[in-house]
Amino acid sequence: MVLIRVLANLLILQLSYAQKSSELVIGGDECNINEHPFLVLVYYDDYQCGGTLINEEWVLTAAHCNGENMEIYLGMHSKKVPNKDRRRRVPKEKFFCDSSKTYTKWNKDIMLIRLDRPVRKSAHIAPLSLPSSPPSVGSVCRVMGWGTITSPQVTLPDVPRCANINLLDYEVCRAAYPELPATSRTLCAGILEGGKDSCGGDSGGPLICNGQFQGIVSWGGDPCAQPHEPGLYTNVFDHLDWIKGFIAGNTDVTCPP
């Protein structure tokens, strides 16, 4: 069984201005409060995703995180303890690979969000640069988010978790998930022996390999973190022209085939 890494109706998030559901990474440790100034929480209806701030006005996340009543929280660490840098934004515009907003588990699971207002850099808000080179199999990658830390049961920590996983050959994921096509614009990442993985609620968050933003959490095995069932991540590098085109105002730009 496979899992789109979104969870719903899990926990009421205690905020001074909203109440939403919440979740975290399997097998990880608590992220350092200073290591994720680019990490955002994306809430819509009763669902949660992650996302990545790529400049003061734009967030990159997964297409399957699209929904109504979307709210985006930046500068957050603890869900229970507010800090002075925390900011709330809503989408001004949302862009997908095509106008029908279609995607599959192995293609076009990417969404670019323009915020209603830019955010200023601070101690806990800063963008993550887009990658300057393609990802390399064997790289050590960092995944992070507020997703469930147990699976299939749900356990919800207060702060984001971070875990190191490996970028694997795409054929490893094809062996685990026979429905995958021969080629895909997704990355395969995880730990072959299991125990560490992104999971429900982490969708849309970043996969950072050798310090570069290479992937977007998309989907994987259910339960999460099982041996020989890595996660799938949208390949950011393959979509650079599309991302940069929209940010520059070129709405005619198209996603790679």
Swiss-Prot record:
Residues 19-24 form a propeptide. The active site is at residues 64, 109, 203. It is found in: Secreted. One of its GO terms (cellular component) is secretory granule. GO terms for biological process: proteolysis. Its main location: secreted. Its EC number is 3.4.21.-. Keywords: Disulfide bond, Fibrinogenolytic toxin, Hemostasis impairing toxin, Hydrolase, Protease, Secreted, Serine protease, Signal, Toxin, Zymogen. Belongs to the peptidase S1 family. Snake venom subfamily. Negative results: does not have activity on gamma-chains of fibrinogen (FGG). Snake venom serine protease with fibrinogenolytic activities. Cleaves beta-chain of fibrinogen (FGB) efficiently and shows relatively lower activity on alpha-chain. Residues 25-248 form the Peptidase S1 domain. Expressed by the venom gland. The lineage of its organism: Eukaryota, Metazoa, Chordata, Craniata, Vertebrata. It comes from the Eukaryota. Disulfide bonds join 31-162, 49-65, 97-255, 141-209, 173-188, 199-224. It is an enzyme of class 3 (hydrolase). It holds the Pfam family Trypsin. This is Beta-fibrinogenase mucrofibrase-4. PROSITE patterns: TRYPSIN_DOM (PS50240), TRYPSIN_HIS (PS00134), TRYPSIN_SER (PS00135).
